[in-house]
Amino acid sequence: MISFLLCLALLIIGYFVYGKIVDNTFGPDDRETPAVRINDGVDYVVMPQWKLFLVQLLNIAGLGPIFGALQGALWGPVVFLWITFGTIFAGGVHDYFSGMMSERNDGASIAEVTGRYLGPVMQNIMRVFSVVLLIMVGTVFAVGPAGLIVTLCKNGGMSGVMTTTLFWLIIILVYYFIATFISIDAIIGKIYPVFGICLIIMAVGVIFGIFTNPAYTIPEIWNNFTNMHPQGTPIWSFMFITVACGAISGFHATQSPLMARCMKSEKQGHFVFYGAMVSEGIIALIWAAAGCALYTITDGKMVGLAEALAAGQSAACLLYTSDA
């Protein structure tokens, strides 16, 4: 438990110390932002800072720091180190600069920003890469929630169309299109902050449950500084790519322009971009701790967690963890 608290403290300190160094390196000033200068009422709309933060958090997080962190916990508490230092020195820096570079270029997408600095060839490569990446991520972010809702409906005694994955996939995709084609403050600006708060409350509830239940103990890094994966899968590089979203993810660069177009001041960037990534790191740290604490460790291996993941994959494991 001490390991967890130390990593949590490092993430918070990292936001105020290293995050400020990153912010000062970029040098935000008082120039007009795209939201103020363009302000078309559709994509460029000034939003309050707290909304910017919560929307950015939900855009970059979602199920990523939950599913990925639970999978990463198979390697044991060493995953805490990757989440902590990856977030501070990699993920936070990446998200801040991708967001602020977009803001400095009229809220341009990552492909357009790449083209302005590296030329048309790299711009087209990044366009193709972004489309492929977004299709892959969009698929996961549709199928994952759909499967989770189906499991909840079945556990709640429902039947019929409400327990079919296809039905919920259609609902989610319809929502995707509606939210994409209308003004950003019509749905995203109103609903996303609520979901963002729910994501935070859920994480707080999980760690509160672990701290208040004597049956659960978060293993210490120094007592388990080894590969605890039941199948012996190497830490390098498998753990690092498994917990990508909870430490650093290039996908975030495709999301940051949304909030870069809604900032009133460049000085909000530290809180909105770096702060959202640190918050995601904290959420990932909590879920990784839950994966390490709630399941049986046999002969120094995370056997219980592996069995839970194999039985129901990440969505089912999320339910088991929440119930516990």
Each predicted region: which residue ranges?
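Membrane-interface "cap" regions at the ends of multi-pass membrane proteins
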Residues: 10-66, 262
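Hydrophobic, membrane-embedded alpha-helices of multi-pass small-molecule transporters
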Residues: 48-64, 209-215, 225-290
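Hydrophobic alpha-helical segments and their helix-loop junctions in multi-pass secondary transporters
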Residues: 138-142, 146-155, 167, 180, ...
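Conserved small/polar residues in nucleotide/adenosyl-binding loops
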Residues: 320-324
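Juxtamembrane helix-boundary/capping and inter-helix hinge elements in multi-pass membrane proteins
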Residues: 73-78, 103-108, 116-121, 260-270
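Selective recognition of specific alpha-helical transmembrane segments in multi-pass small-molecule
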Residues: 7-17, 130, 134-138, 196-214, ...
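Extracellular loop-to-transmembrane helix junctions
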Residues: 2-19, 72-102
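Helix-loop-helix module between adjacent transmembrane segments
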Residues: 15, 90-106, 110-181, 244-248
